[in-house]
Amino acid sequence: ALPAAQLTGTLPAISGANLTGITADDNTPAFMAVPHVDGDYIANTTWEKVLWTTEVYDTDGKFASSTFTPTVAGKYHFTCQIMWEQIDDRTNNHIALYKNGSEYHRVMFYSVNPDGGGGGPISSASLDVTAISDTDDYFEIYVNESSGARHVRGTTHSTGSYFSAFKLAGA
């Protein structure tokens, strides 16, 4: 593989012409964060910001106080998984990506236990979306559930909740 530094300027094309405009763009800024070990309790029917207290990585220092502020214009891909503990049967649960304090994209899952009992000790939902960001935009994750206060799983479990994003190279 060629180092990125060697992919700038003009390169010869097969036709004999020169290729120009080739850049070594990458997928940064990027981050991944998880909740603290004990997670957080989410109140019934209230939209609450998830507190992401542990950074797994943060390539450019753009994630702080549970908020991603890329400061680099472009398209970003966001991924979030929320693991709820003790969700009741037949419950609406939501994850929303907020952009600049307003809902940008929401996903919902409906918890149903085929045995007819409670929804079980663990339920999960995932959000995947691409968003355009200007230099001053910021992004956060909010959740809502309709069955009473529920616990968002933290980092004590290998399959817990997480929030991540990265810039799409060239976008």
Cite the ranges covered by each PLM segment.
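Short, conserved beta-strand segments of beta-strand-rich sandwich/propeller modules, principally
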Residues: 77, 138-140
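Terminal (often C-terminal
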Residues: 21-91, 95, 99, 107-115, ...
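Short beta-strand-plus-loop segments that form exposed binding edges in beta-rich domains
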Residues: 142-148
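Short intrinsically disordered, low-complexity segments
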Residues: 5-8, 37, 137
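Fibrous stalk/shaft segments of extracellular and virion attachment machinery
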Residues: 1-28
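Short, surface-exposed tryptophan/glycine-enriched loops
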Residues: 117-138
